[in-house]
UniProtKB/Swiss-Prot annotation:
HAMAP family attached to this UniProt entry: Ribosomal_bL31_1
GO cellular component terms, A-Z: chloroplast; ribonucleoprotein complex; ribosome
Membrane keyword on record: no
Record keyword Ribonucleoprotein present: yes
A Gene Ontology biological process term: translation
Organism: Palmaria palmata
Major localisation: plastid
Family: Belongs to the bacterial ribosomal protein bL31 family. Type A subfamily.
Name used for this protein in its record: Large ribosomal subunit protein bL31c
Length: 73
């Protein structure tokens, strides 16, 4: 026999807040959700993230250990 009333209450209009601002409305088991980061302020999604490593790994190794490049034979 299945158990009755074991599922959490579902809220179709749960509000999501970030920094005190209402961001979106979703379905959830909690009436309000407070998040620190979302796609609207994350550097990856906003395009403000920069790739710092422009030099390859092999070149860094060669420079670090002062290895001279030689011609392949």
């Amino acid at each position: 026999m299945p158990q009755i009333d074991i599922h959490p209450e579902w809220y179709n209009d749960s509000k999501v807040y970030c920094d005190g601002k209402h961001i979106m409305t979703i379905g959830s088991t909690k009436p309000e959700l407070h998040v620190d980061i979302w796609s609207g302020n994350h550097p990856f999604f906003t395009g403000s993230q920069r790739i710092i490593d422009t030099e390859g790994r092999v070149e860094r190794f060669m420079r670090k250990y002062n290895v001279q490049k030689t011609a392949d034979t």
